[in-house]
């Protein structure tokens, strides 16, 4: 009788990272939070839409807070303690996402605004008339 082939599966080892970078992309429609290590490899990410908010509720500070908590909890499993926060965009989730990360117990070492500013590049969208 032939011997059955057995496949050994190695247990996935989670890497231990003590310092990370939280990239907060706050647009007018959504907020995306990505937590990476120092080299830029993503450890965790979350969005307002992925946290269960749809439509105009995605662009609220509360939705950004929930998304930051979701990304932060996964990053804590990797052992992240210190965070450097880089905020990009003009959206309403800028401040609340940083507050949520601080409330989770992360030590925030620096907060920097990396919003791209054009040197008279593309024409901006026309002003809204309501």
UniProtKB/Swiss-Prot annotation:
Entry GO CC: ribonucleoprotein complex; ribosome
Recorded GO MF terms: rRNA binding; structural constituent of ribosome
Protein keywords: Ribonucleoprotein, Ribosomal protein, RNA-binding, rRNA-binding
Keyword rRNA-binding: yes
GO biological process assignments: translation
Domain of life: Bacteria
One Pfam match: Ribosomal_S11
Transport as UniProt keyword: no
Similarity section: Belongs to the universal ribosomal protein uS11 family.
NCBIfam families referenced in this protein's UniProt entry, alphabetically: PRK05309.1 (NF003698), uS11_bact (TIGR03632)
Oligomeric and partner information: Part of the 30S ribosomal subunit. Interacts with proteins S7 and S18. Binds to IF-3.
Task performed by this protein: Located on the platform of the 30S subunit, it bridges several disparate RNA helices of the 16S rRNA. Forms part of the Shine-Dalgarno cleft in the 70S ribosome.
Name the record gives this protein: Small ribosomal subunit protein uS11
Organism: Laribacter hongkongensis (strain HLHK9)
